[in-house]
Amino acid sequence: MADNKRIVLAYSGGLDTSVAISYLKERTGKDVVAVSLDVGQGGESLETIKQRALACGAVESYVVDARDEFANEYCMKALKANAMYEGVYPLVSAISRPLISKHLVRAAHQFGADTISHGCTGKGNDQVRFEVSIASIDPTLKAISPIRDLSLTRDVEIAFAKEHKLPITQTEKSPYSIDQNVWGRAIETGFLEDPWNGPTKDCYSYTDDPAFPPVEDEVVIEFKEGVPVKIDGRDVTPLQAIEEMNRRAGAQGIGRIDLIEDRLVGIKSRELYEAPGAVALITAHQELENCCLEREQHRIKRDIDKRWGELVYDAQWFSPATQSLNAFIEDTQKYVSGEIRMVLHGGRAVVTGRRSDSSLYDYKLATYDSGDTFDQKSSNGFIDIYGLPSRVAAARDVKFGNGIEVPKNTVE
């Protein structure tokens, strides 16, 4: 039976969720259990975050080391889908919310809570991601957000934190909202809300300035069925692969993203991201797919990848549609094995070599030199058949006076 005196809170250690603990206690009279996940975000130690939750009034606070789970089951799905929302954003925050939601539901079951709370505002995507994910796992649980439901602004939150002496470092002079994990880092609010303002150096943490790179870094990444398994000949787990590429690509300033983004809630927002490891790995994975996927399969997968990214961005990780797309994507990866060589330098990850036993690239068919096995005479019949619909349609257009106009000869 649910204990109505307890609420499970998704706790990040930041301003919104620290304020949420006190607000929940004051407004509901219920005890708050704070849940924090280690998804490779680094920064403050989890012990520090745990103690802060307790200092802010949580009755219990515990953390879950979910780094390998996040890398294996979430980042790798995003990698196989070459997930880039609107062509540039590798879903840094979007893929972590379903994992966090799963552990929140588990904690709610463990502690007998009937309510899960988060610290999201009413303008962001994450409120939708948390609540839709929670409902997809256990529709009997209630989800609330004191920050959103009370329409609290950031300056009011800061004042509340000061008044209640909550141990947070955020100030009115440094009001950035940062979300980070091993897949990347998101920075928003503050002066960045004016889209004309350029990012300053203090915005960045995962990447160095690409204008002043160190010497170029050559790396060879080996994939097995779409998953990185070796870097420069050394065995790596997915987590280790992401972490190493974060360091190496980040040192070269790779993965800085600055865009106006279409949010799920219907507004446009200015977003700043750093995702050096994700960008480098996706670049390598895409090139290996270029070698290993059959043409029509590849064309369809590019469409599927785009739709997968949109669904996951739009809080549909657990939806039937996403699960069906996962099945297609996973099937395409059975031959995506091989090595990609890249040069990392000055903000760019450039592929310089690729090899795979399952590659569909056939040198003898592709070469223009001696040894060419492509029968060029076959092209005549192919063109006749391929161009037949165009010829028939053109004849019809000419008949009705709608043929394509050709410029008259003006040469005298």
From Swiss-Prot:
A biological process from GO: L-arginine biosynthetic process
Superkingdom: Bacteria
Positions bound to L-aspartate: 121, 125-126
The reaction(s) this protein catalyses: L-citrulline + L-aspartate + ATP = 2-(N(omega)-L-arginino)succinate + AMP + diphosphate + H(+)
Binding-site residues, L-citrulline: 89, 125, 129, 177, 261, 273
Disulfide cross-links: none
GO molecular function terms attached to this record: argininosuccinate synthase activity; ATP binding
E.C. numbers: 6.3.4.5
Binding site for ATP: 10-18, 119
InterPro entries in the record: Arginosuc_syn_C, Arginosuc_syn_N, Arginosuc_synth, Arginosuc_synth_CS, Arginosuc_synth_type_1_subfam, AS_cat/multimer_dom_body, Rossmann-like_a/b/a_fold
Subcellular location: Cytoplasm
Family: Belongs to the argininosuccinate synthase family. Type 1 subfamily.
Self-association and partners: Homotetramer.
Name this protein carries in UniProt: Argininosuccinate synthase
Species this chain originates from: Bifidobacterium longum subsp. infantis (strain ATCC 15697 / DSM 20088 / JCM 1222 / NCTC 11817 / S12)
